[in-house]
Amino acid sequence: MKNVYIYLENGTYLEAKSFGANSTTVGEIVFNTSLTGYQEIMSDPSYAGQFVTFTTPEIGNVGVNDEDMESTKAHAKGMFVRKYQKRYSNFRAEESLDQFLVKHNIMGITDIDTRYLTKMVRNEGAMMMVASTEISDKTELKKILENSPRIEDVNYIEEVSTKTSYKHSSGTYAQKEGFKYNEAPTPEANIAVVDFGVKRNILNEIVESKIGVEVIPNDFNAEDLITQYNDKKIDGVFLSNGPGDPLVLKREQEQIKKLIDAKIPMFGICLGHQLLSISHGYDTYKLKFGHHGGNHPVKNEKTGLVEITAQNHNYNVPDNITEIASVTHSNLFDNTIEGLKYNDAPIFSVQHHPESSPGPKESRYIFNEFLSLIKR
């Protein structure tokens, strides 16, 4: 392992050990409280531009496999772990985490106090940082960081969205029925999925809910979708998760506004949830350190039940959006809005991730609610 040198924008300078790729990399540091699922987290496109600090101390124990990828590659800038475990053991593993990171040119940082980093981010907020296995000089690292764009100024959607449309026909993973993905059931409705960085298991859950899926690029044309809806080629539109600040996505906001005006049935998750808010005229704001993990309690306002959810976002919709929508879900950690049903059109959205991956499946019913909305 090589030494790695870290400089954070609050002036903190740290030294640790590296695994994975050797590089000099700039990104935003966040922390994730999930106990499992490091592969799914690193391959989630929503983490583009970020270093993920894992609060679980032992990482790497179960290796990596091709089946648990949430996209075609790893998207996070890097990962902090208290202790990287080189010796992995799992019957599904195909390579080590170190090999995986090298293959995807991602930096891993170990032998560092992740509790210290987590408390720093909690108290001071998510911040920009630079890590390098090539440069140790604090002044030079500071200069690199100061000359790099902030995460709020980068449109990561252009990097993670598909370039061409495609059909998705895989269901969810059947662990008890042969360790394989289910074949798609006969669809009862069809949708277009706008890919802002969609996770594979979101698509799997939609398909499992008997919805036919065509994934389309982020530079979609609203008029085309409206025509397809009127011709009954699609029954609704899904707006996916994705990385970065939703306020920079001006073109996408304009197209979504046209879909809203046309009363197209829509469902949004995470970034899609935020874009629906902005397209209705209610701008999002940045949380201090975001919600990242698989243990976030959310109250279903209709049933009164509490669901433990998976979350991954740094931005949130404003409270005054209740002027045009009803709150369906609320976060019990900080009382932020987690779900909305709009008054003006057949549209609803959630901030958390009902597909989990990793995380609990207590919110999976939301995909069935989408089917009920779009069937005609």
Feature locations, PLM:
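Active-site glycine-centered loops adjacent to acidic/histidine catalytic or metal-binding residues
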Residues: 113, 270, 313, 353
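Catalytic beta-strand/loop cores that center a nucleophilic Ser/Cys/Thr
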Residues: 304-345
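RNA-binding accessory domains that recognize and position tRNA/RNA substrates
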Residues: 1-208, 214-219, 246, 357, ...
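Proline-centered loop/turn at the N-terminus of a beta-strand
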Residues: 107, 190, 265-267, 283, ...
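Cysteine-nucleophile active-site neighborhood
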Residues: 234-308, 359-374
